[in-house]
Amino acid sequence: VYKRQLLYLANIQEDRLAKGELKIVGRRDDGSAILEAVGEATAIPTTVWSGAQFSAGEYGSRYIKRFLGHRSFNFPKSLYATELSIASVVADKPDALIVDFFSGSGTTAHAVMRLNHQDGGRRRSISITNNEVSEDESKKLTKRGLRQGDPEWEALGVCQYVTKPRVTAAITGKTPEGDPIKGDYKFTDEFPMADGFEENAVFFDLTYEDPDAVELGVAFEEIAPLLWLRAGSRGSIIKYEQPGFAMADA
């Protein structure tokens, strides 16, 4: 695992670059170079981390409220703890694909956006979650005669109520109500949360499909998003099987 320190400089240190002590690994939006010290020692992350940035209450629960207002989520992880965890593995992999099989509030996707912002990377993340409602919410909805599958029930599920809005808010810099998010990101790469990220997100529903229909080629529309993901998630999704071809963005 690489332990790196990125140096964000407006003016390149020519001497250290010439000596090979530094190398340019990217550019920020303002044109300043992102430099990396050459020859740093490798290290295995420890099992116990301490520091203000790892507070799940301050940078997990309170951040959810900052991005989503009155909406809440139990025990979200610290954004910065998640960011550092991912960086310890993919800091030197700008094209990495990070898969979160139990995404919850979407902290992993948010952390990947921050890593890309820091070094100009093109990392992608796939967040997978169910749309369960909390136990308390389930009881309230049941008393009202609602059940799973009803639109009002589904609207309060974790995916619809927290994950999607949180990812959208992080990218746009605005709450679900359209208000600019207040505050700045801290510790590494500080900038206003309202600036958002130059990222894209698309949301899909996982469904069960008949294998025979897929094999016979009559379920192309249903599996088109998976084919798009498999091809690298670039350009538009070819939703219909028809003669001709489509050009994806390079």
Question: What is the role of each PLM region?
Answer:
Residues 3-9, 15-18, 141-147, 179-188:
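Charged, glycine/proline-rich intrinsically disordered loops and linkers
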Residues 3-97, 119, 132-136:
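Class I S-adenosyl-L-methionine
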Residues 48, 125-127, 203-205:
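Conserved beta-strand scaffold positions in the cores of enzyme catalytic domains, especially
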Residues 54-55, 104, 131-133, 207-209:
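Short, solvent-exposed coil/turn elements at secondary-structure transition points
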Residues 59-62, 137-139, 212-218:
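Short conserved micro-motifs at the rims of enzyme active sites and ligand-binding pockets
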Residues 63-67, 142, 218-222:
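Short intrinsically disordered coil segments
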Residues 75, 79-171:
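Conserved S-adenosyl-L-methionine
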Residues 145-250:
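SAM-dependent methyltransferase catalytic region
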